[in-house]
Amino acid sequence: MEQLFRPASEPTDRLVLYFNGWALSPIAVEHLGLPEGQDLLLLWDYRTDALDFDFSPYREIRLVAWSMGIWAADRFFAKHEELRSRVVSGTALAGTGYQVDDAVGIPEAFFHKTLEGLTEENRERFDRHMLGGKTYRHLYEEVRERSTEALYDEFIRPFTVDRDQPRPLPKPAAFGLWSKAFIGEDDRVVPPTNQENYWRIQG
């Protein structure tokens, strides 16, 4: 994973841990304010799980994750159980803990269609479709900096990792992490009904 650390103006034992969405960098959330008295660790690029960061100073962790970041956060805390008790709140945005699933994630047919469209020849059209119009021009320019291969590898990784694994509901790796989930009514990637299905069962 890639990381960006922004310390508070004074030393603190509270951390906002933010898992970004697929393909995105810190520019996607740089306009948001950070609560006073809290450090921020922003993570993105989930082609690997590797993370070099010292969590020992923090007594409280406020977890926030966007889309694929929810899957990445579940995976991270499953490998770092010692941190789970420090999570005081968890906010999930526009996604679920199972990245590819016909009932509670991205429908598999849509997932494969997206992969097929993610080619060097189709890259500009793909980026514009994914990021919308001029309102998100700054995101478009930032995403263009990443190679097509990198985006492809990041997008396919959850499917590759989870393909032959059981997907129980509720998801054990997510227990105790999430206190709120926000679902976009017009989400074109993870259908709102699938998100509702997941969070209704996950609780």
Identify the role of each PLM range:
Residues E30-H31, L177, P191-R200:
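Short alpha-helix in the alpha/beta-hydrolase fold that links the catalytic acid
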Residues L17-G21, W66, I183-G184:
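The conserved beta1-alpha1 loop
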Residues Y140-L169:
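Hydrophobic, aromatic-rich cap/lid helix
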Residues F175, A181-I183, D187:
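Short beta-strand/loop motif that positions the catalytic acidic residue
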Residues V64-A73:
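Gly/Ala-rich beta-loop-alpha elbow adjacent to hydrolase catalytic centers
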Residues M1-R59, F110-F111:
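Active-site catalytic motif of lipid deacylating hydrolases and related acyltransferases
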Residues E82-G117, E154-R163:
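Flexible "cap/lid" loop of the alpha/beta hydrolase fold
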Residues Q99-E142:
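Helix-rich cap/lid subdomain of alpha/beta-hydrolase
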